[in-house]
């Protein structure tokens, strides 16, 4: 695995190369959602408005992606910062475009254990999408009652995220912790590592 998360600058290259207009990069369900919901960039990115400074290389009728909304409010989009607020479909399309794939949950955990602190941004930055559907670990037995019912409802149509975000409680930020969301979810602090 790469020793860093995919950056805003990396993701801009994907957009500028037509990443949101090339159906061959997308899973069919993701392409349908992208089309229906008019996705053109990560969830909270915004283009420069008329009168704001724009990138010189950007055609005048297509303002550059210049801002993102964060917990600190509207902030300039910084190329070196990790890209965030991606759906699993967007993360997967980016990986295909880059000639790579999302890591499996097991690959992510093994890399985190083996590389330790060299695996930069593994915790307290962003949850990281994996290629693994959310399933129980081998030998898992659901608890009786409401807890078992709760777990069973979520073990379908979800993908695993590993790592932790700046919003994760400290006790949850460990290599073995799993998070999960539907592949269409874009609101949470999720990015990717290839």
Can you describe what each PLM-predicted range is?
Residues 1-106, 113-115, 181-193:
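Extended beta-strand/loop cores of jelly-roll/beta-sandwich
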Residues 8-9, 16-41, 122-193:
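Surface-exposed recognition segments
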Residues 89, 109-110, 127, 159:
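Feature representing long, continuous alpha-helical segments
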Residues 111-114, 135:
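Active-site-proximal flexible loops/turns
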């Amino acid at each position: 695995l790469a020793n860093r998360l995919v950056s805003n600058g990396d993701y801009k290259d994907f957009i500028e190369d037509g990443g949101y207009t090339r159906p061959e990069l997308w899973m069919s369900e993701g392409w349908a959602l992208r089309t229906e919901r008019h996705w053109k960039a990560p969830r909270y990115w915004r283009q420069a408005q008329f009168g704001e400074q724009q990138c010189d290389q950007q055609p005048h009728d297509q303002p550059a992606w210049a801002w993102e909304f964060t917990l600190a409010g509207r902030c300039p989009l910084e190329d070196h910062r990790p890209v965030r607020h991606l759906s699993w479909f967007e993360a997967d399309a980016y990986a295909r475009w880059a000639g790579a794939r999302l890591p499996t949950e097991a690959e992510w955990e093994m890399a985190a254990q083996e590389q330790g602190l060299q695996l930069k941004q593994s915790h307290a930055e962003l949850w990281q999408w994996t290629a693994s559907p959310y399933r129980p670990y081998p030998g898992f037995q659901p608890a009786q009652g409401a807890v078992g019912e709760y777990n069973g409802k979520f073990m379908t149509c979800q993908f695993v995220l590993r790592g932790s975000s700046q919003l994760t409680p400290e006790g949850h930020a460990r290599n073995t912790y799993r998070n999960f969301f539907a592949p269409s979810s874009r609101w949470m602090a999720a990015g990717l590592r290839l």
